[in-house]
Amino acid sequence: MALSKFQLVALLITYTLLFSCQSKIVKRMQVGPSECVYRGRCRDSYECRSRCGPPEFSHETLGLCMFDYDDYEYFCCCTTNY
């Protein structure tokens, strides 16, 4: 079964997006506690976007909701090391 040019382009774009997302997830998992500036509790990383943004942080700052094994709670981690 031959694919059309449109299907090939769509497949290539999908593959590229999936690959880049997986790379970002791997980098997020490598963030250590010493690389974070903590900004309160959270339920998901979406909550941390506003807490880790301007004016206090640059646009390159990533807000992650990370589990703290000492307190058994999730906290916002603001980091530029990703």
UniProtKB/Swiss-Prot annotation:
Keywords: Antimicrobial, Disulfide bond, Fungicide, Plant defense, Secreted, Signal. GO terms for biological process: defense response to fungus; killing of cells of another organism. Disulfide bonds join C36-C78, C42-C65, C48-C76, C52-C77. Belongs to the DEFL family. Residues 1-23 form the signal peptide. It comes from Arabidopsis thaliana (Mouse-ear cress). This is Defensin-like protein 275. One of its GO terms (cellular component) is extracellular region. It is found in: Secreted.
